[in-house]
Design a protein with these regions (language model features):
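Conserved acetyl-CoA binding element of GNAT-fold acetyltransferases
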Residues: 227-238
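Conserved acetyl-CoA-binding loop-helix of GNAT-fold acetyltransferases
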Residues: 236, 242-255
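Non-catalytic substrate-recognition and accessory regions of acyl/acetyltransferase enzymes
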Residues: 1-229, 255, 260-269, 273-275, ...
């Protein structure tokens, strides 16, 4: 027995790659429903297994982390063909993952997991929150719930969901769900099949924080409350991505916040590129139908008072509203709207870029400064055109006629 251990130790020392596994590949995620177990892979595992995202000391390693589609109760199982036992660098995988999972997670015993889910449902498990919105897409129906984090079931649901933040959001971290200023919104796909269980499936979720905003001395003593909503985490499960559901989820939440008088601004905490894209397109579509937004007013000489008044009315933060105005200007330029020149649009966008980076540019000579600004502008212009894609906006032309299909097919400038 000892000789076998010694042999494996020698092999590990000489061929460590045989005992090293990518944690991104080893960890296999599943959402199970009555018909199937839907598999997807994590984007990141470094918050759990370290920056190298590798696990040493196991052969043929598979880590199965499964969730019920309705309650999201987790099940963990770990399988491997061999394990080194005499190396202090070898981690206890279960102990490592347990730190990020709720205490009620079932380990190894799949029958016990299935029975525990059935027991929860037999005891009357319901979505622990309030229905605040619904929509249909691709012949399917979806509900948005604001989860009651003060309730035991609401808090537990968040505990079950939160590991996904680490696995899909770079630099993501857990929130303090006991802080009453946090909100959790969960998107569900309704079960429209002719079955008796009527169980919806979790599609994604977002967390948002309520910030009190100082209203200024004149309003400070008023009883009116002014809040900023900050979207912190936003996840659509990979098995539901590519269907436009994230954009619809965001848009319906934003519409809810628009209707609340105490909310004066909606901001996003450190958005990544994919969420920026989702947000830009959703915001453009909302402006497209908004009675509070006048596309005619958007020119390179746009009135500053109109900008601030409109931005406040539609509750967008300054950076995001500025981006939307720039995208609309490029849209007008692309489609040949009167009075919009490439030079004016370029100078308009460069001014914001300069103001944003004024401190860093101040140390550069004029030629280098111009080169830096032009490079930044060109990258931004390319990105804006990518975001626009084939999007059509209801902008009236000089003759007060809305853009036609012919105009929309003009060659990009």
């Amino acid at each position: 027995m000892s000789s076998a251990k010694e042999q494996s130790s020698v092999t590990a020392a000489l061929q460590p790659e045989q005992w090293t596994t990518s944690s991104n590949e080893a960890l296999k995620l599943f959402v199970t429903n009555p018909e199937a177990a839907l598999n997807f892979q994590p984007t990141f595992t470094y918050p759990i297994f370290g920056d190298a995202e590798t696990i040493y000391g196991y052969k043929d390693l598979d880590i199965f982390l499964c969730f019920d589609h309705y309650t999201f109760k987790p099940f963990l199982n770990i399988k491997y063909s061999a394990k080194l036992t005499d190396d202090p660098e070898i981690i206890d995988i279960k102990k490592t993952i347990d730190e990020f999972l709720p205490k009620l997670t079932i380990f190894k015993d799949e029958v016990k997991w299935v029975d525990s889910i059935k027991e929860e449902k037999d005891n009357g498990y319901k979505i622990p929150g309030k229905l605040i919105g619904s929509f249909s897409e691709n012949d399917k129906e979806y509900d948005i719930y604001k989860i009651d984090l003060k309730s035991d079931n609401g808090y537990e649901l968040h505990q079950r969901l939160q590991i996904l933040v680490l696995l899909f959001i770079e630099a993501g971290s857990f929130i303090d769900a006991k802080d009453e200023l946090w909100n959790l919104y969960v998107l569900y796909e309704k079960d429209n099949k002719s079955t008796s269980n009527n169980e919806s499936s979790i599609v994604g979720f977002t967390t948002a924080y309520n910030y009190w905003k100082y209203p200024g001395a004149k309003k400070f003593d008023s009883t009116e409350q002014e809040l900023r909503i900050k979207i912190s985490q936003f996840i659509i499960l990979p098995i539901y991505q590519g269907q436009g559901l994230g954009q619809l989820f965001y848009s319906h939440l934003f519409d809810k916040w628009l209707a609340q008088d105490d909310i004066i601004e909606v901001v996003v905490e450190d958005p990544n590129e994919s969420f920026d894209d989702l947000r830009d397109r959703a915001d453009l579509k909302r402006l497209n139908t908004s009675e509070q937004f006048d596309f005619k007013a958007v020119t390179p000489k746009v009135d500053k008072e109109w900008v601030e008044k409109t931005r406040r009315a539609i509750k967008l933060e300054k950076r995001q509203f500025a981006r939307l105005l720039e995208i609309i200007l490029l849209y007008k330029l692309k489609h040949g709207y009167p009075g919009i020149t490439k030079r004016d649009v370029r100078l308009f966008i460069k001014k914001r870029l300069y103001d944003k980076n004024k401190e860093g540019l101040a140390t550069l000579d004029d030629n280098t400064k111009k080169d830096k600004l032009q490079t930044a502008y060109q990258a931004l212009e390319d990105d804006y055109y990518r975001i626009l894609g084939d999007l059509k906006l209801n902008i009236k032309r000089g003759n007060d006629e809305e853009e036609t299909d012919t105009v929309s097919k003009k060659q990009k400038v």
